Amino acid sequence: MKYYLKEEFLNDVNQKNAGNKARNDVETVLNELGYIPLRVLVDDWYKMNVLKAQIHKYQALSKAFKLLKRGDEIVIQFPLLHHSLLFSNLLKSLRKKGVKTYFLIHDLETLRFVNDETLPFRMKLRMKITEGSSLHYVNGIIAHNKVMKGVLVNKGVLGEKITNLEIFDYLIPDFIEKTSLRKEQPIIVAGNLSQDKAAYLYSLPIEPQFNLYGVGFDESRKLSNETYFGSFLPDELPSALEGSFGLVWDGDSSKTCSGVFGEYLRYNNSHKASLYLA
């Protein structure tokens, strides 16, 4: 049987953050391909201490994986929505059991936060432990592109088991193509507009005009050539966008993609590109 890991949580606080859109679309595609969801229900572990939360998540994953049999395949979207320090042990057990596991990578946390001086050492250590060991126990990996593949190979992952996705799907229910778009219209910026990810928004050049969509924008610092339209659910966002070209940019400078998130664009395929093309 072919499965995909479906993580379910009691509290979903990110409804208007497109961070879940890519994962949801992957699940939709896998469903259409005949994959079966292997559900993992995790309680609100934010109310637990660190040790209790780790034990709870490990037990939830272990319970789900016990349903898999020799010859089964499972696709896991990586990283897990909420990490488990013992995840690699579970993958090792699946391998011994004869279950084939595949990662579809959304982010490499060690790559994204390697230069983040504000991140506590214990969190960086956790990322290194959970990410590095897990990558070696799977049968195949879907990476973003050849640059990310190169990073994985440098980490010791066999190149022949890595496939490049190139770009994420952005599924739109009840799609209606817009016909009134003109290149002289404002530039679109959509996504997470918070200070730590998109500080460049407060130092953009005076031309052209920009239309902004997303969470975290500080309207009190809005520039004269910026129009903020608020935030929308991911499936509603494409029809709400007004403008010409979409801007794929992150970081604290409008001159170059700098900072933690700006540098990360060198390696990943931004989901914004999928949104704009859709």
Mark where each language-model region is.
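N-terminal pre-catalytic "stem/leader" segment of glycosyltransferase-like enzymes
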Residues: 1-89, 95-102, 111, 115-116
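Conserved catalytic-core segment of nucleotide-activated headgroup transferases in glycan assembly
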Residues: 168-242
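Carbohydrate-associated surface elements
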Residues: 147, 165-168
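Acceptor-binding helix/loop patch of EC 2.4 sugar-transfer enzymes
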Residues: 102-126, 257-260
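Nucleotide-sugar-dependent
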Residues: 239-278
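Membrane-proximal helix-turn-helix segments that form the acceptor-binding/catalytic region
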Residues: 90-100, 120-141
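Alpha-helix capping/helix-boundary segments
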Residues: 109, 147-149, 194
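A short, active-site helix/loop in glycosyltransferases that binds the activated sugar's phosphate group
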Residues: 113, 133-161
